Amino acid sequence: MKKILSRALVVCLALSSLPLASCNANSSVGKRQENVLRVASWDEYIDEGGEDSYIPTSDALYKEFEVWYKEQTGKSITVEYITLQDNETMYNKIKMGDEYDLLCPSEYMIMKLAAEGLLQKYPESFFDTSIETNYYAKNVSPYIKEVFENGKLKDGSSWSEYAAGYMWGSTGFVFNPEKIPPEVMKSWNALTNPLCERKITAKDNVRDSYFMGLGMYYEEELLTLKEQYKNGLVSRETYKSELKAKMNDTSPETMNGVKKKLEEMRGNLYGLETDEGKLDVIMGRLDASFQWSGDAVYIIDEAEAYSEEDENPLLLEYSIPESASNLWFDGWVMMNGANVDAATAFINFLSIPINVIRNMYYIGYTSCIGGDEVFSYIEETYGSDDESEILTEYNLSYFFGDNHILITTEEQTRRQLFAQYPDEGTIDRLVVMEYFDKETNTRVNRMWNNIK
């Protein structure tokens, strides 16, 4: 992982001002072709092979899939792997008539595409664990499986009917515990705390910003609710339902309260950022930043590597607010008219344990796939038997299944391991943010544009 992160930092420095482009020169065609699987995803979101791969002699995974598919089916397939800039770019291309077999959007865009009737459901055979090559159904984490089966679309369908999980994570704060007390970073109001004045950044996008605003606006109510749940006064179902309702509240009254919180936040920030803020934290110029968990791992890794020759290396930590935070995921979905056989085979190929490990190593994010082989990789990455350090048990059974307990250093429960796999108590307070309908989207964008 260190190799790819160092490479990514160089790319970030050199190309941060350039737009992302497709890795396939023919992507502008936009139409399906016979024996071609059109896959749309994000830049550097799959193992591209070569020296930065977990297996340096390997080819890109989507190229290796072509060989595997021929071996499995006797049929030839060419993967046209297209990278897009963001979810909105993906949506606009679809609305303009571009056709894809597989897409890898984020959770809210999956909901939007499904609601607009642009996606087709997975066949029942995809979930049949008796089929040898159904690696996704056999290996998906029990936690992710539950999230997808319990998540509902407007028509009552489960997310699992339309989406197969790829990567997942949380949102929280990366921070320097030597400069800002960890207790401060357990609250959404760190964004307005004088101790963080001009030392913290937030995301320059409306969805993350509105979620942060909701966190500040409802923090006291959510902490009270959490205490009631902890003391057995409310059920888990009630707790999760209330969390979801509060952290997806877009009523005019709530939006006005959120606006005031975000205005207060804006005056306390160093600035709003997309990717450039990562480097400021890595270099020690900023003390805290709101980040997605995968980027948090990258920042923590790079800050330590950059300062490793210093007398006091920069050891950043990751904190998820105590009241609530965001559970995000990217998932594979099929457009109407997709090549179902090739599309589902592609997902299953990526769900083979060694390919899961390759993707996690290359990307730095956390796969939706569990299983013993992936746990062994996490154990290899974060486990420790060094008796000179403070060791602790870290229970990952919620994700990998019963009796998957990692022996790790105490500091990892606040650093990369915690960012990739929060403990089960933290998982309970994570909630998915749903998509905005057209009217809500107009209101929230108007509010955000007036603030930033």
Residue ranges and their predicted role:
Residues L84, C104-P105, A202, L272, ...:
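Short beta-strand and adjacent tight-turn residues that come in two discontinuous sequence segments
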